[in-house]
UniProtKB/Swiss-Prot annotation:
A GO cellular-component term linked to this record: acetyl-CoA carboxylase complex
Pathway given in the UniProt record: Lipid metabolism; malonyl-CoA biosynthesis; malonyl-CoA from acetyl-CoA: step 1/1
Keywords: ATP-binding, Cytoplasm, Fatty acid biosynthesis, Fatty acid metabolism, Lipid biosynthesis, Lipid metabolism, Metal-binding, Nucleotide-binding, Transferase, Zinc, Zinc-finger
Protein's name in the database: Acetyl-coenzyme A carboxylase carboxyl transferase subunit beta
Residues reported to bind Zn(2+): 31, 34, 50, 52
Cofactor(s) this protein requires: Zn(2+)
Subunit structure: Acetyl-CoA carboxylase is a heterohexamer composed of biotin carboxyl carrier protein (AccB), biotin carboxylase (AccC) and two subunits each of ACCase subunit alpha (AccA) and ACCase subunit beta (AccD).
Classification lineage: Bacteria, Bacillati, Bacillota, Bacilli, Bacillales
EC class: transferase
Annotated ranges, domain CoA carboxyltransferase N-terminal: 27-286
Organism (species): Exiguobacterium sibiricum (strain DSM 17290 / CCUG 55495 / CIP 109462 / JCM 13490 / 255-15)
Zn finger (C4-type) location: 31-52
Gene name of the encoded protein: accD
Length: 286
């Protein structure tokens, strides 16, 4: 009789007869803009551009392979610099962790290759490594690549993707802003071309130095570009900023960019610029 008045259990444990199959890591990718989930291989086949137009981040190697002709790329070795100039606590361990995770030595990869037959020196920042922050190694790599381009009389491009100066290197990091700008000035004085392509995100000391010094300043759609953060600016001026503030489209309308170029059109865009500024074309017009 007591069993009749007992309350039924609210929860019932069900045993699964089959072992759950885990989805492999990296099989699917979710777009942060439209929330679409699609196969990663399908996204990569479309240059990592979602159907909604959102440009997913590229690795440095992917950027080189998308822009340059196959079989023409020669990567530069990183210049030898002290990895931890200020003996910052835990910094060496963080560097090693990023090196293992990304397979990179630092937050930048530099090299030379051909874009539809036109030679070009390129520096590509990779935000996976210390958020693409600029330290002594990054500054030295950019400076040496520009020095090589000046010596060989080649155009140069830099793909920026950075959170700014690397805080663990303090003043040494800030010095790279002036150092890279100086080498770009020498490159410009030699009458050579520099194209700056800003990708998401390009902020801090990078946006205040070499990223904005191009003969052509272009950016990918939807890229965040600016020096200080949105919240800091709003608190300083005590005003609400536009929703599209610090986007590449906003900067284009304000006249701070020459163009916003989709990833699908980037190689064609570079080809036109390099063709116009090649030495052969210049000699033909003299």
């Amino acid at each position: 009789m007591q069993a009749f008045f007992r309350k039924p259990k609210k929860f019932v444990t069900l045993t699964s007869k089959e072992q759950r199959v885990d989805v492999p890591v990296g099989l699917m990718t979710k777009c942060p803009k439209c929330k679409l989930i699609q196969y990663t291989k399908q996204l990569e086949a479309n240059l990592k551009v979602c159907v909604c137009g959102y440009h997913h981040p590229l690795t440095a190697t992917e950027r080189f392979e998308q822009l340059f002709d196959a079989g023409t790329i020669t990567y530069f070795d990183l210049p030898a610099v002290k990895a931890d100039p200020l003996d910052f606590q835990d910094y060496p361990e963080k560097l090693k962790g990023d090196q293992v995770r990304t397979g990179l030595e630092e937050a930048i990869v530099c090299g030379v290759g051909q874009v539809n037959g036109y030679p070009l020196v390129a520096c590509v920042m990779d935000a996976r490594f210390r958020m693409g922050s600029m330290g002594a190694a990054v500054g030295a790599a950019i400076s040496e690549a520009i020095r090589y381009a000046t010596k060989e009389r080649l155009p140069v491009t830099i793909f920026s993707a950075s959170g700014g100066a690397r805080m663990q290197e303090g003043m040494v990091s800030l010095m790279q802003m002036a150092k890279s700008s100086l080498f770009l000035k020498q490159h410009s004085d030699a009458g050579l071309l520099y194209v700056s392509c800003m990708t998401h995100p390009t902020t801090g000391g990078v946006s205040a130095s070499f990223a904005m010094l191009g003969d052509f300043n272009i950016a990918e759609p939807g890229a965040l570009i600016g020096f200080a953060g949105r919240r800091i600016i709003e608190q300083t001026i005590r005003e609400k900023l536009p929703e599209d503030f610090q986007t590449s489209e906003f900067l284009l309308q304000a006249g701070q960019l020459d163009d916003v170029v989709s990833r699908h059109d980037l190689k064609t865009y570079y080809t036109r610029i390099l063709m116009m500024h090649s030495e052969e074309t210049n000699h033909a017009t003299i």
